[in-house]
Amino acid sequence: MYECIQDYLTNHKDEKNIYVNKCISIVGSPLSAGQSLSGVNKACDNLRKFGLHDVIKAVGWGYEDIGNIGEKIPINGFLKQENIEKENDQINNNNPSYYNNIKNAEVIGKFSEKLFQTMSSELKKKNFILNIGGDHGVAFSSILSMLQTYNNLKVIWIDAHGDINIPETSPSGNYHGMSLAHALGLFKKKVPYFEWSEKLLHLKPENVAIIGIRDIDKYEKIILKKCNINYYTMFDIDKKGIYNIICEALNKIDPNKNSPIHISLDIDSVDSIYAPGTGTIAKGGLNYREIHLLIKSISDTKRVVSMDIVEYNPLLDESDKAVHGDSLPIDPNATKTGKLCLELIARVLGNDIV
């Protein structure tokens, strides 16, 4: 029924990535303004503390740690829902060509521009870009920066949620639930403080596959179908298996099997049994083996050029215990979700069982 995965993936362990050097640019993106919980901005430094650099070296890669992009928090803190229109009316002077219902638009827009500039600069080095969030709002700049260099970029968006609301349909005004729609150019108006991005190349719907969704808002369902986006729910994964799903997804978005690939991994795609440290939990997610096989299968193409890992919230995480199979140099005090994040980073870099 499906093209054999071996026909798509390149399984020679010694073959190099055809697009990037064996060196990683680590970019910390501690954006938290795209959602409402504190703690997600601590993920970058937590992963460093738990052994990020040692893990990268252990799997044979070099790295350059660029540090963290600064998030400028307003004096009065982030906005509550009831104050969104007041803030954005002040920003755009009631200009009808602008949206006025995106929470913390100024903070997010300015942060996103800095992130875009940083990643664009790092791309000149031909390094693999590892973008550690932060909330999933950071993916907008990540994807757009990659697209300006790799205009045929394909995106695998791994998430419990669609993140494809537009401001007209968003029930919360939280940007992290709209970032994919924004990257796809689906917004009908301008966004305050995102003017820098208006003329940039945006992602085409046929070049993205969403995997693992199980918590979709009413209007997101309409948008997904209307835009003919490739998506795979947890029901699809249960019926077909994760192995067949990633094979099908790759063949659909990249039939010529030669394009660079960006992975945008929201850790809430994983079931909370394995990844409790995240703010928007939905029951029935990917299990431990499924997420590892998914990342490994994409990595085996030898064409992954960048990865977001987002929505890890250390303040919500749980302790973990060491087991005999733990072979990576991860701090024994690492919490459950933090440890999984590091394992998946190693996996995308080619770490294998044998």
Curated annotation (Swiss-Prot):
<protein>
    <recommendedName>
        <fullName>Arginase</fullName>
        <ecNumber>3.5.3.1</ecNumber>
    </recommendedName>
</protein>
<keyword id="KW-0479">Metal-binding</keyword>
<feature type="binding site">
    <location>
        <position position="266"/>
    </location>
    <ligand>
        <name>Mn(2+) 2</name>
    </ligand>
</feature>
<comment type="subunit">
    <text>Homotrimer; oligomerization is dependent on Mn(2+) binding.</text>
</comment>
<feature type="binding site">
    <location>
        <position position="266"/>
    </location>
    <ligand>
        <name>Mn(2+) 1</name>
    </ligand>
</feature>
<dbReference type="InterPro" id="IPR014033">
    <property type="entry name" value="Arginase"/>
</dbReference>
<comment type="pathway">
    <text>Nitrogen metabolism; urea cycle; L-ornithine and urea from L-arginine: step 1/1.</text>
</comment>
<feature type="binding site">
    <location>
        <position position="159"/>
    </location>
    <ligand>
        <name>Mn(2+) 2</name>
    </ligand>
</feature>
<feature type="binding site">
    <location>
        <position position="172"/>
    </location>
    <ligand>
        <name>L-arginine</name>
    </ligand>
</feature>
<keyword id="KW-0378">Hydrolase</keyword>
<feature type="binding site">
    <location>
        <position position="136"/>
    </location>
    <ligand>
        <name>Mn(2+) 1</name>
    </ligand>
</feature>
<dbReference type="GO" id="GO:0004053">
    <property type="term" value="F:arginase activity"/>
</dbReference>
<keyword id="KW-0464">Manganese</keyword>
<feature type="binding site">
    <location>
        <position position="159"/>
    </location>
    <ligand>
        <name>Mn(2+) 1</name>
    </ligand>
</feature>
<dbReference type="GO" id="GO:0000050">
    <property type="term" value="P:urea cycle"/>
</dbReference>
<dbReference type="GO" id="GO:0005829">
    <property type="term" value="C:cytosol"/>
</dbReference>
<comment type="similarity">
    <text>Belongs to the arginase family.</text>
</comment>
<dbReference type="Pfam" id="PF00491">
    <property type="entry name" value="Arginase"/>
</dbReference>
<feature type="binding site">
    <location>
        <position position="163"/>
    </location>
    <ligand>
        <name>Mn(2+) 1</name>
    </ligand>
</feature>
<feature type="binding site">
    <location>
        <position position="268"/>
    </location>
    <ligand>
        <name>Mn(2+) 2</name>
    </ligand>
</feature>
<feature type="binding site">
    <location>
        <position position="217"/>
    </location>
    <ligand>
        <name>L-arginine</name>
    </ligand>
</feature>
<feature type="binding site">
    <location>
        <position position="165"/>
    </location>
    <ligand>
        <name>L-arginine</name>
    </ligand>
</feature>
<dbReference type="GO" id="GO:0030145">
    <property type="term" value="F:manganese ion binding"/>
</dbReference>
<dbReference type="InterPro" id="IPR006035">
    <property type="entry name" value="Ureohydrolase"/>
</dbReference>
<dbReference type="GO" id="GO:0005634">
    <property type="term" value="C:nucleus"/>
</dbReference>
<feature type="binding site">
    <location>
        <position position="161"/>
    </location>
    <ligand>
        <name>Mn(2+) 2</name>
    </ligand>
</feature>
<comment type="function">
    <text>Catalyzes the hydrolysis of L-arginine into urea and L-ornithine, which is a precursor for polyamine biosynthesis. May play a role in parasite intra-hepatic development during the host liver stage.</text>
</comment>
<dbReference type="GO" id="GO:0019547">
    <property type="term" value="P:arginine catabolic process to ornithine"/>
</dbReference>
<dbReference type="InterPro" id="IPR023696">
    <property type="entry name" value="Ureohydrolase_dom_sf"/>
</dbReference>
<keyword id="KW-0056">Arginine metabolism</keyword>
